[in-house]
Structure formats: C-alpha cells, structure tokens
C-alpha cells in the first residue's frame, strides 16, 4: 500500500476537454486551495463520470471515488504543516530566550572579570606598598646596625626549610609564633672569656665615669648625686652583678653583657637606670667556681669508694662582706666642687687630705681647672647679677694620657673642638697637634676642629680622654665603633 506522499508524487493526468461530454460546464481543476476543493466536493452529489480518451484505458474513474481521498490528504498535510509551524515558532521563542540568557551571562562574566581585575590590581598595589615599607624598615635597621659595627647574618635557607618540614600542619601556627622570629640567644655559643681583656675594659669604663654626678629628683627640685660603683664579681664560670643572681657565661643575656663590655660599651641592660654610664667595683674571682645549683659546699669531709678520706675543697666561694662604706665611697657622695661668688671651691680635696692620714686611699687624680672665657663670664655674672638664671654651659672633664690628671673646662655650646684643643695645649704647655681628644662611649675621635660642642654631643657635660696622636685619619669624626 502506497503512502499519501507517494501518491502525491505521481503525476495526475487530466483528460482533455471534450465539448461533446458537457459543453456547458467548465473543466474541473484538480489542484487548488482548500476552498476550491471544498466547493468541488460539495458539487459532487451525483455520481458523474468524466469521459477520458480511449488511450488512458481503464484509468479513468468516477470523481466520487478520487475526491475524498485527496481531501483527507490535503487536510492531513495542512495539520502537519500547522504543527510544524507551531514547533518552529516554539523553537524560535526558545532560541530567543536562550540568546537573551547568554547575553545576560556574558554581561555577568564581564562584570566579574572586571571586578577580579580591579581586586587583583588593588592587591598588587597593597603588596607593592607593603614591600616598599618593609624594604625601608630593613634599610633603617641595617644602617642602625652598621652604626654600631654590626651586620645582619640571618639563618641559612636550608635550615629554615628543614625546620618547616619537621613541623606538622596542626602546629604550624604555634611554630610561626615560637620559631619564626630570630632569638639572640640562638646565635651565641658559650665563649672563651678573656679575663684580662674583660678586666681592662671594666677599668676603662669605670675611669670614664669616675666621679660623675647624676641628677636625682628630690621633693621641691633636684640635686646632683654621685654614682656609686656597681659591685661585679667575675667567677670562672660566670658573673654576679649587684647582689645576684649568678649569671653563667652560657646564658644569652650574660653573653650580650660581656660583648658590650668587651666592645667598649656599658651594658645595654643598665642603660635605663644609668643612661650616662656607671662605674664598676670589680672582684676578680676567676680562680673560683660558683656553684650553679645554689647550694653551698659540703662542710665536712667527703668519702668515696676505695678511699678513706677526701681532702676538703679549698677553693671556696668567698662570702659576701657587709655593706661597709669606704673612704672613697664617702668622697664620691660629696660634690667635686661648687661655685660661690664666681670662685670654684674644691670640696673633695680637703676632705681627702683629712682622711688620708687615718685610712689608706687610692692614688688621687689631680684635677686642674682651666681658665676659659665661659668660666670668666660666669664668674662675672655671679658677682654682678647672681639672681639671673645660669645659661647653658658645657662642663668637660678631660683625663690626661696617663690618667693622673683631669682637666676641668667650662665652655659655651658654640665653642669648637679647636678651642678646647688650644686651651688644653696652653694648660699643658705643649703643642696642640701632639695629642688627640677622644671619648669611649661611644668610641669617637674628635679631629675636626671646626665642629662645635653642641654638634658633637658634648653638652651639657662629657668625660673625654687624651692620647698621643698616632696617625691622621681621613674622617674628621670617626663613627661609633671605629675607634682605632
């Protein structure tokens, strides 16, 4: 049985019009629209046959049999076309909806990409700013370390990587707090202490501030108080400052303290209490070992297996003597000199001479007051108008090369190093180019005669040293830590 489409593909042969069949009726149109087909179907009430030529044979058939079949076929095709048109319209609507959704998604993606780009640029700018800030801080810290002759070393990268591998992920945050930062004690090893150099450095530091007075606040004002030496005991295995506790050499804080002293500086741990330095009263006990367990020596005789007796330990730690004031401590409590009506009156000298006969005294340092323009002006001011406030002055105490003499100079802050050198040369009756003026805290050699005392940091008072000129240096004022 053939399909309706197959029947449509067949060419229908229309018979020729014959005037003899029905001359008064128009010829039948086989193909037309649905209205024509319906009109054609309505007019087929009677079984009317179309006469065909004899050449078609038996193909000719009554119109009443062929008409309904073509009408159903056309109606079916019409319905299918309508369904296809509806499907096509629905698909077109769906495509338009999807296109609109795609456009919306593209706009959203573009907006997100732009936001991400802006966030990335902002983060990049923040990181660059932070990097510049950290680089500036690192530069400042490196310059600070170089001022003291130090250099940052750090840790090897392989060591840091090995430490990071051994730490678990759960303890990573704790490790960041405990191990990420450098600890000064981790870089120090127990040193071999040079006791002779340590004693010499302590003596130099004590001589530098010997007899200095410190401003102490009192009710209603302030007064000068002579610094008392700090008791310092040096044992074979550590030191003891003040009244304890004992500090072994392997302790990081002790190593830092010894390093400061050996480098010619006062310990940094004493800077808050004594910003200008403090003398030390050193007890050399290098031949004794301090018991680190805090227990004293066994008082009786010890016994071991195989021996009857064990000799008593002889290197006992000496007991702390009572706090008895010596004559030198008593003199240090007194002011060195006072100014009355323009005259500098020595206070310690007569009392020292009185005490010299009754108790042994160390060798006295001869103090020489150098006549300066500032001293003469201050003497005149105190006589003419004693009620006027005292102007800003610089009190210099300069020790000679052998330490037996100390020159006291009252200078203006505007005076220069050259003025000090000329006054010292006149007082000593020698050439000004034969000696150098230096300070040990910080180590500085003053060679530029044009530098003022204010610029050199020698106001309001300072303690300096003299030494024989060794060689001419290229820099006028050496940086701290460069003292030859």
From Swiss-Prot:
Ranges of residues in domain UBX: 389-466
Alphabetically ordered keywords of this record: Coiled coil, Cytoplasm, Cytoskeleton, Phosphoprotein
Coiled-coil annotated spans: 69-147
Cellular component, GO, one term: cytoskeleton
UniProt subcellular location: Cytoplasm, Cytoskeleton
CDD domains: UBX_UBXN11
Disordered: region residues: 1-28
SUPFAM superfamilies: NSFL1 (p97 ATPase) cofactor p47, SEP domain, Ubiquitin-like
Boundaries of every SEP domain copy: 227-291
Record PTM Phosphoserine, positions in chain: 478, 482
Assembly and binders: Interacts with GNA12, GNA13, RND1, RND2 and RND3.
Protein purpose: May be involved in the reorganization of actin cytoskeleton mediated by RND1, RND2 and RND3. Promotes RHOA activation mediated by GNA12 and GNA13.
UniProt name for this protein: UBX domain-containing protein 11
Lineage: Eukaryota, Metazoa, Chordata, Craniata, Vertebrata
């Amino acid at each position: 049985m053939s399909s309706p489409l197959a029947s449509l593909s067949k060419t229908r042969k229309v018979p020729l019009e014959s005037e003899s069949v029905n001359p008064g009726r128009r010829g039948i149109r086989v193909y037309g629209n649905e209205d024509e087909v319906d009109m054609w179907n309505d007019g087929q009430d009677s079984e009317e046959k179309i006469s065909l030529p004899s050449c078609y044979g038996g193909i000719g058939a009554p119109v009443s049999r062929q008409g309904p079949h073509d009408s159903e076929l056309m109606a079916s095709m019409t319905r299918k076309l309508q369904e296809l048109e509806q499907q096509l319209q629905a698909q077109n609507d769906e495509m338009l909806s999807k296109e609109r959704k795609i456009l919306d998604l593209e706009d959203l993606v573009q907006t997100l990409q732009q936001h991400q780009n802006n966030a990335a640029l902002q983060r990049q700018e923040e990181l660059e700013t932070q990097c510049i800030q950290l680089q500036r801080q690192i530069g400042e810290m490196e310059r600070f370390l170089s001022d003291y002759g130090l250099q940052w070393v750090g840790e090897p990268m392989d060591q840091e990587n090995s430490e990071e591998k051994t730490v678990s992920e759960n303890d990573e945050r704790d490790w960041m707090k405990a191990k990420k930062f450098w600890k000064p004690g981790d870089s120090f090893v127990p040193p071999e202490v040079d006791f002779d150099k340590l004693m010499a450095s302590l003596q130099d530091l004590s001589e530098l501030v010997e007899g200095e007075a410190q401003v102490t606040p009192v009710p209603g004002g302030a007064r000068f108080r002579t610094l008392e030496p700090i008791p310092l005991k040096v044992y074979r295995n550590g030191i003891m400052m003040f009244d304890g506790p004992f500090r072994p050499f392997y302790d990081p804080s002790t190593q830092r303290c010894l390093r400061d002293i050996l480098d010619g500086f006062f310990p940094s741990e004493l800077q808050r209490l004594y910003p200008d330095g403090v003398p030390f009263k050193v007890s050399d006990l290098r031949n004794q070992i301090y018991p680190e367990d805090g227990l004293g020596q066994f008082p009786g005789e010890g016994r071991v297996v195989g021996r009857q007796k064990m000799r008593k330990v002889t290197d006992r730690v000496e007991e702390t003597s009572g706090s008895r004031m010596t004559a030198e401590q008593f003199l240090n409590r007194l002011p060195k000199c006072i100014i009355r009506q323009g005259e500098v009156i020595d206070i310690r000298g007569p009392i020292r001479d009185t005490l010299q006969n009754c108790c042994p005294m160390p060798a006295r340092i001869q103090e020489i007051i150098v006549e300066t323009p500032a001293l003469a002006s201050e003497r005149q001011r105190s006589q003419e108008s004693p009620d006027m406030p005292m102007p800003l002055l610089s009190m210099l105490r300069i020790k000679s090369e052998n330490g037996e003499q100390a020159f006291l100079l009252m200078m203006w802050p505007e005076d220069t190093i050259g003025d000090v050198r000329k006054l010292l040369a006149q007082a000593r009756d020698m050439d000004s180019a034969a000696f150098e003026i230096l300070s040990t805290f910080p180590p500085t050699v003053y060679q530029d005669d044009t530098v003022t005392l204010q610029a050199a940091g020698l106001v309001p008072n300072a303690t300096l040293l003299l030494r024989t000129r060794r060689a001419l240096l290229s820099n006028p004022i050496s940086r701290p830590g460069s003292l030859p």
